[in-house]
Amino acid sequence: MSKGISEEIIASFKQQLEQHPIYSAISTVDDLRCFMEHHVYSVWDFMSLIKYLQSKVAPDEYPWLPDGDTSIKRFINELVLEEESDQALPDKNNSDGFSSHFELYCEAMKEIGGNPHDVHAFLDQIKKAGINKALANTSIPEASRIFTRSTFKFIESGKPHIVAAALALGREHIIPCMFRSFLQEIGITEQDAPAFHYYLNRHVHLDEDFHAPLSLRLLNELCGEDNIKQNEAIDAAKAAVTARLDFWDAVLEEIECNRKRVKTG
């Protein structure tokens, strides 16, 4: 009988990501701004992974029939709820609202002088012409373009277990921690960047407490005891890690080029 995909397997992949030099390379607000203007596309395409999985695990079909692991259904539904319509930062009147994590991230970008215009132009083009034309014809950064294409290749496989493998590797707990440490180091307080700090607090809480163990359960639920699916999922996890490492390499190179432009400009 197959034992499934273990936490150790996923952890071994994540270790490569967490040791990437990009996390220690960000030392100025300009570096952070450059990072975020690339990373925002990864924040956006994560929603497509979970929306695809929701359509497979908890489809909106009727007549409805009870079927499958209800804890997995709840996980994917809650993940969509949190990512698409989480509690927003209270406004000046302390009124509560709701916001996607992508929109929160864009607000955080603006607080440190980043410009989300290009990613919004990219989304506008998706509405008009679809994802493939948008990736080919917009001013999306090259590193982000390549990474986003890799995400949609997982989805286009039409295999939920492959998409779940990409999901399991789609979050890196080190990023919110890196952001928080950097903001503290250069003195950007919660008063200076309330949306940024709020975004980080939400992610650390949700990722560490809920998402990681349940994403592995979802992956094993979709693979079952099928060795072929398990091997495909492991291969997809490796591919997801490679895509992310290549992404970080390219973003780090762009950060270094940006530093040179600032010095010579």
Sequence positions of predicted segments:
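Non-heme di-metal
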Residues: S2-G265
